[in-house]
């Protein structure tokens, strides 16, 4: 009886009772709740969940209780502010965190803490919560988590906060459907970027591209399909001749020559040619203007089997080749080459989580992609 009366008092609006009187009633209620049954605490939590200004101490006590008690407060209570939710995230159970992760209109600070403390199930719930605001640093954390937990990839790719840097990294461990979604959304034309930087090429050429940062940026922006200087230096002369040589006798030298003629670094080529799925090879071939017969010759030169099975890597490669426009394939290839090679540091491999937040996007991408086993 006393518990019910006190619940009625603390549930009164502040137009009927002073805040101080209600808080004192709440202090007494806390002691009764600690000694009361779970059913009593559930009833109280259900009642307080509908109040916008329920007594804070009582609300926090019940919100940290067993999830059977805490659920309505964690799901609905507007009396719990971001600070309260962060505290609960840090101190309560995984079940509490999963309920909070599904809460409407979560702010970035709460989401950050959930990403730090949450298990894979919590992260999955969080990614599916379209009303949650996810910061760029937490997106970085979620992308890293998706490397080792494939169930996170699909909901991650649906987030509006996902950037090209994130997407083109996730590509390497996404499945076939995920890769198609990435290419459809992020493989865009660079027309505006190319036009805005068109006058920079002759200026940089006057200095023989001495500024390394500018040179690497222009390598991403440039429109050329192949590296003419590399073709002039190569003993093969053309990309097609290099592919023929690789088909006859593959070795590291000719594979590197193919990379240079394509305008990419060997580290990028190794990632592309070693990709089990096939789509990466298709992107390279389309970007450099390789005809269909030489696409298959390159595939064979890499000692990859040609199969009619629609689910085979060869058919996945062929589908991607036929689906992509040249300009869009160039965007992806150039971005990969810039991201994987412009700030590559072997000491970062396997240590993406340890990099400083101020590390360049390219350095983070290289550590993330090159520092893990390949899978599709």
Regions found by a protein language model. Give the residues of each.
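Alpha-helical scaffold segments
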Residues: 1-376
């Amino acid at each position: 009886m006393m518990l019910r009366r006190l619940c009625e008092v603390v549930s009164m609006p502040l137009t009927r009772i002073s805040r101080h009187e209600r808080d004192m009633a709440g202090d007494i209620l806390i002691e009764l709740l600690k000694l009361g049954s779970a059913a009593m605490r559930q009833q109280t939590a259900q009642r307080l969940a509908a109040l916008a200004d329920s007594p804070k101490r009582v609300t926090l006590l019940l919100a940290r209780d067993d999830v059977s008690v805490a659920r309505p407060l964690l799901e609905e209570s507007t009396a719990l502010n971001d600070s309260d939710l962060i505290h609960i995230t840090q101190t309560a159970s995984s079940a509490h965190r999963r309920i909070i992760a599904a809460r409407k209109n979560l702010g970035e600070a709460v989401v950050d803490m959930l990403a730090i403390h949450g298990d894979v199930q919590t992260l999955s719930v969080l990614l599916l919560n379209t009303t949650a605001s996810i910061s760029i640093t937490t997106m970085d954390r979620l992308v890293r988590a998706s490397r080792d937990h494939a169930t996170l990839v699909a909901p991650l790719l649906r987030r509006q906060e996902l950037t090209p840097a994130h997407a083109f990294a996730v590509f390497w461990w996404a499945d076939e459907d995920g890769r198609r979604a990435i290419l459809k959304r992020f493989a865009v034309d660079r027309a505006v970027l190319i036009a805005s930087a068109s006058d920079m090429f002759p200026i940089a050429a006057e200095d023989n591209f001495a500024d390394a940062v500018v040179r690497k940026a222009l390598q991403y922006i440039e429109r050329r399909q192949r590296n003419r200087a590399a073709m002039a230096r190569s003993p093969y002369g053309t990309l097609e001749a290099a592919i023929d040589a690789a088909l006859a006798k593959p070795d590291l030298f000719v594979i590197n020559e193919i990379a240079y003629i394509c305008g990419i670094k060997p580290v990028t080529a190794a990632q592309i040619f070693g990709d089990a799925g096939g789509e990466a090879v298709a992107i390279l071939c389309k970007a450099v203007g390789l005809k269909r017969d030489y696409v298959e010759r390159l595939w064979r030169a890499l000692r990859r089997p040609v199969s009619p099975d629609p689910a085979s890597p060869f058919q996945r490669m062929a589908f991607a080749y036929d689906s992509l426009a040249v300009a869009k394939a160039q965007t992806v290839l150039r971005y990969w080459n810039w991201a994987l090679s412009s700030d590559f540091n072997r000491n970062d491999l396997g240590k993406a989580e340890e990099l400083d937040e101020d590390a360049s996007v390219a350095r983070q991408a290289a550590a993330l992609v090159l520092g893990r086993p390949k899978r599709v």
